[in-house]
Structure formats: structure tokens, C-alpha cells
Curated annotation (Swiss-Prot):
PROSITE patterns: CLPX_ZB (PS51902)
InterPro entries: AAA+_ATPase, ATP-dep_Clp_protease_ClpX, ATPase_AAA_core, Clp_ATPase_C, Clp_protease_ATP-bd_su_ClpX, ClpX_bact, P-loop_NTPase, Znf_CppX_C4
All copies of domain ClpX-type ZB, residue ranges: 5-59
Gene3D superfamilies: 1.10.8.60, ClpX chaperone, C4-type zinc finger domain, P-loop containing nucleotide triphosphate hydrolases
Organism domain of life: Bacteria
Upper classification of the organism: Bacteria, Pseudomonadati, Pseudomonadota, Gammaproteobacteria, Oceanospirillales
Protein name (Swiss-Prot/TrEMBL): ATP-dependent Clp protease ATP-binding subunit ClpX
Subunit text: Component of the ClpX-ClpP complex. Forms a hexameric ring that, in the presence of ATP, binds to fourteen ClpP subunits assembled into a disk-like structure with a central cavity, resembling the structure of eukaryotic proteasomes.
Entry similarity comment: Belongs to the ClpX chaperone family.
PANTHER family recorded: ATP-DEPENDENT CLP PROTEASE ATP-BINDING SUBUNIT CLPX-LIKE, MITOCHONDRIAL, ATP-DEPENDENT CLP PROTEASE ATP-BINDING SUBUNIT CLPX-LIKE, MITOCHONDRIAL-RELATED
Main function: ATP-dependent specificity component of the Clp protease. It directs the protease to specific substrates. Can perform chaperone functions in the absence of ClpP.
Length: 426
């Protein structure tokens, strides 16, 4: 049948009807044909109106405007994965909520008031949960996320990574969708390692310290970065992608070892004379106690340039994890290490049991090694290595029990054989 039969006023062979509303071609202005299906112009207009209404309820970043989690919900989501650090969670939750609330209402509020961006600085010892906090926030908000290592960055023109590479990694993680990338989260780790070597500006060029801080300034504050397209050098004829970093949330984290001494020098200046208080090194404040009193001048004294500190107005401090916290980390969070290894053993058809003493011993070892929660995996991996080597070739083991001595490596884990289990239950 020719297209002529679908136009209004054509009374040739037979009368055609809209498959959706049932009106004939004489009752509408236009009838559009598909494979054995027809739709009139009125139904097309109705469909367009429905789509327009639905799109108006969707915010620019693809989420419903009422789906932005409140600070309380964000903090609760962090509780599922990160143990302790309640103050840091609260600071992060409020900062992230305000950041994305600002993005959702851009252009909708009083144009005379421009809301600034508040990037975040996380200060805490190794293994205290800095990276995990940032990762969890990105997962909860369903936004692109990338981690950059500040120690690999150098000024443009020197051997090492340029700061623009950070944005390229973010683009890669969202399939080069520029709009999505411009609302993502970037976590820059080891930010304390790019502190300048002394308080006074150096005559020689510091390309991996102060130079990197200078290069990061514009990126963090907001600039348009030129990033090679997908394929990079393979397609040099393609134009560079322009990414506006004004709405990207930057979270910088570092251990800042030695910062407690800088803070103590400021807060506990010894008096002179007979009233002077003599303190031994042992009496000095611990990192966790001192770091909560950190001020901008302490970070500048440590080696961050004032302009860089000014771009990170929100500071969240994390405490050192104690033995009880490490034990909880092993077993309580949704992705706890104990649960991960138990699932791994389940895939072999074997039950894995950890005694309370074994968890305490693993926590003690992590404290001794000063590796925090990050060191727990290597401790369990080492203790379970022989079991994971043997089990795939054995079908007589039904259960493995870990105690304190097996965690220390003094004895092998207890393997319960199938016949022993049957005899016990008989």
C-alpha cells in the first residue's frame, strides 16, 4: 500500500484508523503509518506532552529532584560500610548534600546570589577510612568517581602525570559522558605528600610539591579542562573534550604525619621562667587528640600553600582506630572482611569460622604494624593462604576454624573433616 493512502482526504481503497485512539483518517489532520500500525497527530502530541511532563520532574543529572539523600540518610549509608568516625561522617554528609543541592537549584534561585563550591579535606592516619568514605558517598549518590594519587602528579612539561589526567580518568569511568563527569566526585589521595619542603618559597623549582599545588588550584576551584577524546593519540584529528570542573566535587585526603607536632607548637607554647611547664615527648598529644584542633595556619606551616588550603574550606578529621573498632570492622559492615572470606570459602562448599579471640588477635597485629583497617586484609590473607591452597583439591573438609594462634601463624587453621562432623552429629 502506498503512502498516499495515509494522508487526510484520501478516500481511495479503504478508510484507515489510528491504532491508539481509534479515530479515522477523516477525523484527524495526519495519520502516520508504521508496520501494520497507525498513529494520528493528536496521539503524537499527547505522547510528547507526557514525555515533557516526566522530563520536567527529572533534574539535570538524571535523578528525581526529591531523591537527593538528606545528610542523615547519607550518614546512615556511610554507617553501613565505615565503622566509627562519626564527626567526619557528619561533616562529609552536610558538605556533599549542600554541594549537590547547589547543583540541582542552579539557575532556579535568585541569580544575584551565587553559591560557591566547598571542596573537602580529609585528615586522618593510614587505614582510618578516608578513601572508603569518598567511595561510599559516590556509590550512594550514583555519580562518577575516580581516585588520583597526588604523588604521581607533576607540573605540566615534566615527567609524571599532568593534573588534567585526573579529569580524563573521571571521563573514562563514565564512558566519556561529559555531562555526567561534570557532576562527579574526585578523590585525591596522599595530598600531604605534595607539601612544599620548607615554609619559605624556594629558589629552585619544586615540580612535585608546590608546583603541583599551583597546578591543582584552578582545577579544584573551577576551570575548563581540555581532555583528549576516547582513543587519544590514535585519533589525533578529533577535537579535545572541554570539561568544566566548576561542579566537580574534589575531596583531598592525607595522613599528614607530623601535623600533631605543628598543632602542639601552636597550642602548647611553653612559658619561660619558674612557671614553665616541662613536658616530655611522651606527654605530647597523640595524633587523634591534636588533629581535631587543626587550623588553616597549621596546614600552611605543614607545607600546603595558603591558596590551596583556601580551596578546601571543609576540613574533616578522622581518628586512629582502636582495637575494638578494628574488631568491629572485621565482622560488622556490609562488606566486612570476615563475610568476604566466609563467602569465598562457601564457594568451595566449606564453612569458615572465626573465634572472637582470632578477631582480637588480628586487630592487635594491625595496631602493632600501624596499618589501620587497610592492614587487616593482608593479615587474614596470610593466615588463610595454606587453606585456600589446599581446599580446591580436597573434598573431605567441611569446616575451617581460625583461632588466635592460627592468626599469628603459630599453628595451622583447624580443618574439620566430613567424617568427624558426621561422627559428632551421630
Amino acid at each position: 500500500m502506498s503512502d498516499d493512502n495515509f494522508s487526510r482526504g484520501d478516500h481511495s481503497d479503504r478508510l484507515l484508523y489510528c491504532s491508539f485512539c481509534g479515530k479515522s483518517q477523516d477525523e484527524v489532520k495526519k495519520l502516520i503509518a508504521g508496520p501494520s500500525v497507525y498513529i494520528c497527530n493528536e496521539c503524537v502530541d499527547l505522547c510528547n506532552n507526557i514525555i515533557t511532563q516526566e522530563l520536567s520532574q527529572i533534574s539535570e543529572d538524571g535523578e528525581s529532584s526529591d531523591e537527593l539523600p538528606t545528610p542523615a540518610k547519607l550518614s546512615a549509608a556511610l554507617d553501613d560500610y565505615v565503622i566509627g568516625q562519626d564527626k567526619a561522617k557528619r561533616v562529609l554528609a552536610v558538605a556533599v548534600y549542600n554541594h549537590y543541592k547547589r547543583l540541582r537549584h542552579q539557575g532556579k534561585t535568585d541569580t544575584s546570589i551565587e553559591l560557591g563550591k566547598s571542596n573537602i579535606l580529609l585528615i586522618g592516619p593510614t587505614g582510618s577510612g578516608k578513601t572508603l568514605l569518598a567511595q561510599t558517598l559516590a556509590r550512594v549518590l550514583d555519580v562518577p568517581f575516580t581516585i588520583a594519587d597526588a604523588t604521581t602528579l607533576t607540573e605540566a612539561g615534566y615527567v609524571g602525570e599532568d593534573v588534567e589526567n585526573i579529569i580524563q580518568k573521571l571521563l573514562q569511568n563514565c564512558d566519556y559522558d561529559v555531562e555526567k563527569a561534570q557532576r562527579g566526585i574526585v578523590y585525591i589521595d596522599e595530598i600531604d605528600k605534595i607539601s612544599r619542603k620548607s615554609d619559605n618559597p624556594s629558589i629552585t623549582r619544586d615540580v612535585s610539591g608546590e608546583g603541583v599545588q599551583q597546578a591543582l588550584l584552578k582545577l579544584i576551584e573551577g576551570t575548563v579542562a581540555s581532555v583528549p577524546p576516547q582513543g587519544g593519540r590514535k585519533h589525533p584529528q578529533q577535537e579535545f573534550l572541554q570539561v568544566d570542573t566548576s561542579n566537580i566535587l574534589f575531596i583531598c585526603g592525607g595522613a599528614f604525619a607530623g601535623l600533631e607536632r605543628v598543632i602542639s607548637d601552636r597550642t602548647e607554647k611553653s612559658s619561660i621562667g619558674f612557671s614553665a611547664t616541662v613536658k616530655s615527648k611522651e606527654e605530647g598529644r597523640s595524633f587523634s587528640e591534636a588533629v581535631h584542633r587543626v587550623e588553616t595556619e597549621d596546614l600552611v606551616k605543614f607545607g600546603l600553600i595558603p591558596e590551596f588550603v583556601g580551596r578546601l574550606p571543609v576540613v574533616a578529621t578522622l581518628s586512629e582506630l582502636d582495637e575494638e573498632a578494628l574488631m568491629t570492622i572485621l565482622s560488622q559492615p556490609k562488606n566486612a572482611l570476615v563475610k568476604q572470606y566466609q563467602h569465598l570459602f562457601e564457594l568451595e562448599g566449606v564453612e569458615l569460622e572465626f573465634t572472637p579471640e582470632s578477631l582480637r588477635e588480628a586487630a592487635k597485629l594491625a595496631l602493632e604494624r600501624k596499618t589501620g583497617a587497610r592492614g587487616l586484609r593482608s593479615i587474614l590473607e596470610s593466615a588463610l593462604l595454606d587453606c585456600m591452597y589446599e581446599l580446591p583439591t580436597r573434598n573431605d573438609v567441611v569446616k575451617v576454624v581460625m583461632d588466635a594462634t592460627s592468626i599469628r601463624g603459630e599453628t595451622a587453621p583447624l580443618m574439620v573433616l566430613e567424617k568427624e562432623e558426621l561422627a559428632k552429629n551421630a
